[in-house]
Amino acid sequence: MKDLIKAREEIDLIDTEIIRLFEKRMDIVKDVVIYKIANKLPVLDSSRENAMLEKNINKIKNEEYKKYYEKVLKGFLEASKDMQKELLK
């Protein structure tokens, strides 16, 4: 049981770091929106999104984890696009 508690505590620490990085990412997304507005660019840039997905998924060393990381990354992208759309209203 102690190992389970320790593992969960480690996960909690990692989650805290993920939250910090997510907030930082979303702050930068706001900067991207400002740029897109100033330059009359669309929210969706499929070529950038696809290249970023491929590049980052390929950074995962454990092949077993790649499909799961892809889901996480796509979730981040959707959240970013949703926020951009909200800010463009």
Language-model regions: role of each:
Residues 1-89:
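Domain-level signature for soluble enzymes in the chorismate/prephenate branch of the shikimate pathway
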